[in-house]
Structures are given as C-alpha cells and as structure tokens.
Amino acid sequence: MKITQLPQEFIDAQPILTKLEDAGFEAYFVGGSVRDTMLGKTIHDVDIASSAFPEEVKSLFHNTVDTGIQHGTVMVLDHGTGYEITTFRVESTYTDFRRPDHVTFVRSLEEDLKRRDFTINALAMRHDGEVLDLFDGLEDMKKGVIRAVGDAEKRFTEDALRMMRALRFSAQLGFNIEADTQKALVDLAPNLAKIAVERVRVEFEKLLLGSQASQSLELALRDQVMNYLPGPHIEDWSSIIDDLNKDQATNYTVAWAHILSRTQFDDKKRRQFMYDWKMSRNVMKTVNAIVPIVHNPKKSTVFDIYQVLAYQEELLEVLSLTGSQPETIQRISHIIEMLPITKAADLNISGGELIRSGILTPGPLLGRVLKKIEYAVVVGDILNDHDALEKFAKEYVNDQN
C-alpha cells in the first residue's frame, strides 16, 4: 500500500531517509506517525528506524546528539528540527518488566518490528509513502482491533506497561482488544503493580482523555486491572463511566477532578489518592479547590466561588461533566462574571496605606483587617472604593479595641 499525500512532517524528513539509503542502509518511518497517518489523524513528529548502527549514523550526519545511544538512538538535527534515528534492534529479557537488560543491533527490519507492542504500531513506511506491513497491522486497523505482535503474553511480560497502552489505544481509537491479547492482559495484570507509578499515570491519563474512555474503563474493571493501579480503591465507577459516555474531559487535571468529584472520599483519602498517583502539586491544588464545590454546588457561596476563581474553567467543566443542572452552572458563571474583584491585589487600598494613615500597625491584626475587607468587597457588603474601605478598616479596628 502507498500513501500518495504525505503529511508535511514526513516530507520534511525525507532527505534524512534518502541520505541513509544513498549510503547503502535501509531507513523507514515507523511507529505512531505511520499509524496515525493511516487513520487520518494529525501527526506532530516522526520516528525513523534504520539498519545503520549509531556510529554509522553519526558518520553520515554532521549535527547529531546522543539522545539514547545505548539503545541505538541518535538525534539528527536538520534545519532546526531534531529527528531521532533508532537502529534496528532485538531485545533481551526484561527483569524489571520495563526495559530490556540489553539490546543487540541488527540489520533486519522484520526482527526490529517483531519486538513492537501491537500490530498497528508495527508498520513501516519508505520515504516515498510505500507502507510495509509484516504483521497484518493494516487489516487489524480496518477491523478496529488491537492485537499484540506475536505472543501477547511475551509482549506483556517484556514490558507490563503495554497492558495500559492496550487500554489507552482502545480508549483513543475506539478499537476492541483482540481475544488472545485480552486474555494475556487479564493473566498478567498483577505485573502492573511493579511498574513505576509515573509511567502508569501517563498512560491512564491518556486513556481518560480518549473518546472511548468509558469503554476502556469498563474493560479494566471487568478484567480487574483496576486492582493493580495506585491509590485507595474506588468502589463504584458507574457514575464516572456514565459521565464519560456523554462527554470527555479536555485535560488530565479536569479528568482527575471529575473522578474524585464522583467518589465519596473525605479530604484525607482524596489527598492520599493523589499522592499515591504522584500527581503534580498544581493538579493536587486544583482538585482540592474545586471538588468540595462540585460536591455541593447549590450551597456554594459567592466567596467560595471567588476562592477558586483561578480554576474557574476546570470547575465549570467538571460541573458539566458530572451533570450539574444548567441553572446551577449558570448561577456559578453569573457569580464569576459579577465579582467586583478577582484577587486581593484588586482592592483599592493596601496594607501599606492603612499603616501610613495610622489606622493600623504591622502585625497580625493588619492581616485580619485586609482579609475582612476582601471578604466584604467580594460579598457586596461594601464597594471597592478607597474611602469606603478606609472607613471600614477604622470601624473594624475600633470594634476590636
């Protein structure tokens, strides 16, 4: 099969392949860029595999970087763009369920493609668009099937993360997982507990953003994959899956906030869940801010909304995902639009001014007064006017005395 209209990313990289070929080596585009082009999806970068060994690649191109030379990868810099060229290779045993103990460079494309995870990812393409399909990946693509290359049990034993990748591709592409591949996933799911949490999280986040995330979550639950994922156990995924049947999160922060909004975790358990998944501080901060409001949106006050203003987009999206009433979302949107200030710095008076006017001196009381002023302005008790705020501060200090 030949692709007649190549994306620009391939066209830009064609000189790299032809230079390798002119020197007597084989060179192909491989991996996700070929798969996604066949599926009509946008690609962002390309991967190149070649029979040239790393030192041979470096001798051909003047501007190179050893990005992973021990695994056969050299980056070639061409007109400001970096292209990773990886030597055809075979891999040894995987004692850590992640990386091969060692790799051996070979001259055979078939031997290289044999080690890849799924048939849809084991396609190679010549510089002119001719696609080489040694493992029926095109047929599996046509059928909408995710099938391991060769022995599924062997592929998943080599790298347990491939099980999460199977579920992720199912979510992203809407493909079914082939029966033998699915059986191996069920049998070897316990090995997921041996994989670094960060690697599992990246795949799970991609799954959650897939158009068929609900389908993949149902598979993961049915096959008890969830039992080997990090964090306190979520007893009931049904409402999460129902939500994702209707819509998807636009980013992984929203995805996590959505999941945790649908659990009955208390604050401590929610924090433990995020810690176990090794989420970033920014994600934790966002989730902790908006989940309490999503749990009780009708009871949220103007000041509650003001306090999470920095996360308003995430809040409104999670409210929509969880099926909050339109009038509830409209009310919160209206509160956001009508807020007199968006942050304390918007107040028309400062701590320095209160000190210079003699109303206050530096100390804890100053901080309390500024907090009181901020609250009063936000809820509409006073206007954000300098004189009004100064008067409010004086009265508050007098009351305290």
Swiss-Prot record:
Record-stated family: Belongs to the tRNA nucleotidyltransferase/poly(A) polymerase family. Bacterial CCA-adding enzyme type 3 subfamily.
Binding site for ATP: G32, R35, R116, D159, R162, R165, R168
The keyword Nucleotidyltransferase is annotated on this UniProt entry: yes
Function: Catalyzes the addition and repair of the essential 3'-terminal CCA sequence in tRNAs without using a nucleic acid template. Adds these three nucleotides in the order of C, C, and A to the tRNA nucleotide-73, using CTP and ATP as substrates and producing inorganic pyrophosphate. tRNA 3'-terminal CCA addition is required both for tRNA processing and repair. Also involved in tRNA surveillance by mediating tandem CCA addition to generate a CCACCA at the 3' terminus of unstable tRNAs. While stable tRNAs receive only 3'-terminal CCA, unstable tRNAs are marked with CCACCA and rapidly degraded.
Assembly mode: Homodimer.
InterPro entries membership: Bact_CCA-adding_enz_type3_sf (IPR050264), CCA-adding_enz_C (IPR032810), CCA-adding_enz_firmicutes (IPR023068), NT_sf (IPR043519), PolA_pol_head_dom (IPR002646), PolyA_RNA-bd (IPR032828)
SUPFAM superfamilies: Nucleotidyltransferase, Poly A polymerase C-terminal region-like
Protein name stated in the entry: CCA-adding enzyme
EC category: transferase
Positions annotated to bind Mg(2+): D45, D47
Record-linked PANTHER family: CCA TRNA NUCLEOTIDYLTRANSFERASE 1, MITOCHONDRIAL
Catalyzed reaction equations: a tRNA precursor + 2 CTP + ATP = a tRNA with a 3' CCA end + 3 diphosphate; a tRNA with a 3' CCA end + 2 CTP + ATP = a tRNA with a 3' CCACCA end + 3 diphosphate
Encoding gene per record: cca
Cleaved signal peptide residues: none
